[in-house]
Curated annotation (Swiss-Prot):
Pfam family, one: DM_Arn
Keywords in alphabetical order: Endonuclease, Host-virus interaction, Hydrolase, Inhibition of host innate immune response by virus, Nuclease, Restriction-modification system evasion by virus, Viral immunoevasion
Protein name: Anti-restriction endonuclease
Gene from which the chain derives: arn
Domain of life according to the entry: Viruses
Any one GO molecular-function label of the UniProt entry: endonuclease activity
GO biological process: symbiont-mediated evasion of host restriction-modification system; symbiont-mediated suppression of host innate immune response
Organism: Enterobacteria phage T4
Protein task: Pays a role in the inhibition of the host restriction-modification system. Strongly inhibits the host mcrA endonuclease that cleaves 5-methyl and 5-hydroxymethylcytosines at the specific DNA sequence C(me)CGG.
Amino acid sequence: MIIDSQSVVQYTFKIDILEKLYKFLPNLYHSIVNELVEELHLENNDFLIGTYKDLSKAGYFYVIPAPGKNIDDVLKTIMIYVHDYEIEDYFE
């Protein structure tokens, strides 16, 4: 596959609950984020997703939708996966 680098659009977004998790339970944060990104890579061909190594960007992700894919649909898919982790339960 050949991709014209000028046509690639990369988005950055933050998931607040994951940023909060990093502040309180950093080891759990890393475990969940690594598993989440791996799962999304294995089960979706609609986008590429990754995290930043800079820990000041905990909770931030970059995503590159496949050509013709809508970023709103991509974000909905990602949030469905995040919701499945039931992260809110760790704060009760």
